[in-house]
A protein has these predicted regions:
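N-terminal leader/linker segments that precede catalytic domains of diphosphate-processing enzymes
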Residues: 1-270
Length: 270
C-alpha cells in the first residue's frame, strides 16, 4: 500500500514536471525557461524513482505491465520443466503421451502439493483440463486472473508446497516405459541451465492468453549412459529420436513435416 501511494505521488510529480518542461522549451520568458530547465532536471530523477517504487515481485517490468493489462482477464498458466539430453550433438526426444505423432523433450508440468491449494484458491485458480488431464488436477496447468500473476510467480519461485525435482517425468517417460534400463539411470546428475518465458501471449491453439514457462535442465551423461541412449533410439525408432538443432527449429525430424513439438527448440534457447 505504501509503495502504491508513493507511486501515485511520484506519477503526479512526473506529470507536473513534464508540463513545466514543455512550457520552458516553448516560451521566450526567461523565468519560465529557467523553471522549465529545473523541471527538466527533476524529470529524469522522478522517472527513476517511479520505476524503483514499483513492486514487481522480482518479475521485471514486462510482467508487471502485463499483470496490469490483463488485470480482470483469465490467463492460462503452463509451468513446466524439460530435459536437455544431448548425445553426440543431437538431442533426445520422446513421443508425446497426448500428441502421439510428435516427438518432444522429456519433461512435463510441475505439480503442486495439497498444502498449496489454499493459496491457489485465494487467487481463484481453476485447473485446465482441456488437454484431457481430467484426473491430474494437481498439475500447474491452471487459469488465474491477470492481477494475480506476480503473486503466483513469486510463490512459484519460492518452491514452497510444489514439486521441484524433475526426476518424476524422466522416470515416467523413459524408465517406467522400459525405453531405458532403470539401474543405470536411477541417479541423475543435472543442472538448470535456462528458462523459457516469453510472458503473456495469445495462443491460437488454446484460444486464450497464456503464460508458458519452462525450466530447462541439462542432463550430464556418462559414456555408458550415452551408449545406452543410442541403443534405445535404435531399438525404438517410433518412440525415441535424436534430433539436431536444425530439426528441432524446423519441427521436422528425418524429413517428416511437423513431427517435432514446438517446445523442442526451447532446449537451445528458441
Amino acid at each position: 500500500m505504501e509503495n502504491m501511494k508513493r507511486t501515485i505521488v511520484l506519477s503526479f510529480l512526473f506529470v507536473m514536471t513534464g508540463i513545466f518542461t514543455c512550457i520552458g522549451v516553448s516560451t521566450d520568458a526567461s523565468w519560465l525557461a529557467m523553471l522549465g530547465a529545473i523541471a527538466s532536471a527533476i524529470f529524469g530523477t522522478i522517472i527513476s524513482m517511479i520505476f524503483e517504487s514499483i513492486d514487481t515481485h522480482g518479475q521485471g517490468m514486462k510482467l508487471w505491465m502485463q499483470h496490469i493489462k490483463y488485470w480482470k482477464q483469465d490467463i492460462r498458466l503452463s509451468i513446466a520443466y524439460l530435459f536437455r539430453i544431448e548425445v553426440d550433438g543431437k538431442y533426445l526426444l520422446v513421443k508425446g503421451n497426448r500428441l502421439k505423432k510428435q516427438f518432444q523433450p522429456v519433461g512435463g508440468v510441475y505439480k503442486f502439493y495439497a498444502e498449496a491449494k489454499p493459496t491457489l484458491e485465494k487467487w481463484g485458480f481453476r485447473p485446465d483440463t482441456k488437454m484431457g488431464n481430467i484426473d491430474e488436477t494437481d498439475d500447474l496447468r491452471i487459469y488465474i486472473k491477470g492481477r494475480h500473476l506476480l503473486s503466483f510467480m513469486e510463490w512459484f519461485a519460492s518452491m514452497r508446497d510444489r514439486e521441484y525435482d524433475p526426476y518424476r517425468e524422466f522416470y515416467e517417460e523413459l524408465l517406467e516405459t522400459k525405453l531405458l534400463p532403470t539401474e543405470p539411470f536411477s541417479r541423475l546428475k543435472y543442472r538448470k541451465v535456462m528458462v523459457h518465458n516469453n510472458g503473456v501471449l495469445y495462443s491460437k491453439y488454446m484460444r486464450c492468453n497464456e503464460l508458458v514457462y519452462a525450466d530447462i535442465f541439462e542432463l550430464e551423461l556418462s559414456t555408458k549412459q550415452k551408449e545406452l541412449i543410442k541403443a534405445a533410439v535404435a531399438r525404438n525408432p517410433d518412440m525415441l529420436c535424436l534430433a539436431s538443432a536444425e530439426e528441432m527449429i524446423s519441427q521436422c525430424y528425418n524429413g517428416i513435416e511437423k513431427n517435432v513439438g514446438n517446445n523442442a527448440e526451447w532446449l537451445i534457447g528458441g
